[in-house]
Amino acid sequence: MLDSKKIYLPNKPNQKINVKKIFAIDSDLTVLGFKDKTQWVPETDPTYVFDKNTTLAILAGFQHDRRVMIQGYHGTGKSTHIEQVAARLNWPCVRINLDSHISRIDLLGKDAIVLRNEKQVTEFKEGILPWSVQNPVALVFDEYDVGRPDVMFVIQRILEVDGKLTLLDQNQVISPHSSFRLFATTNTVGMGDVTGLYHGTQQINQGQMDRWHILTTLNYLDRAHELSVVIGKVPELKNAKGKALAKSMIQLADLTRQGFINEDISSLMSPRTVLTWAQNYMIFKDIKHSFRLTFLNKCDEAERPIVAEYFQRCFGEDLTESHNPDS
């Protein structure tokens, strides 16, 4: 159980990290990480491609104890970005998905019946929040804009730097560990969903939003960056033919994004969708079939002819969906 274990690391990070070398980013920023790796550190993905602005915001959060929120469309790698930075700093990282079933009890803890000397006794089991606050942990709240209001006000207690966590049931006040860090990812900027893409998101109290020191936006990547991601994850496409195919995939994704902005279609392809399509292509060896399975079948039936037209523009081939049966 997490709540029964302490992470034994120095109170402060003890190893200098060369940002330019480790993250391939032209920056003079100096950051510190931990020399030793523990079981809570995410696995390093050597093919990961870092976005400069997002990475610098995350690094500032780690180095200067800033509360960092990353906002952006789905599939852009917001949470993965934090994990991969943490992995290279050897910084323990825990992610919590703030779905509607997460409660105050889940975060703070509860009384539980346990066996002690063959007798049942009631004992308080602390939740993930007190455990994280007391350890050198980067705590990441995913889907932050889906959290319930009562849960959000629990989080508000620790948003301020050196903000102490009070457990009323235990008459206990917990001071944060000097290397505790807090991050969040969100699809909206706390004003609710205006796109229709993110059902279930809620408006966030502006007093709470004000407590986040840094808000950076990670939306869709430029084509060269996105191509690097796809080629890195699907090395079979590193040849000339494969790169040309990947470029056409990304071109099609851009058309769906532009179509969404213009309100021509209600679905769009994220970088994750493009990557999934490339991986499915390697399985089925059929660009049309893998496209249908990855994205087209998820589109509104009335919009499929438009998406099929995008496909024809990029690949010079027709899909059967190109012709609207109602026309």
Predicted regions and their residues:
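Alpha-helical lid/collar subdomain of P-loop NTPases
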Residues: M1-T38, Y48, T55, D222-L227, ...
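AAA+ P-loop NTPase catalytic core and its hallmark functional loops
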Residues: M1-K243
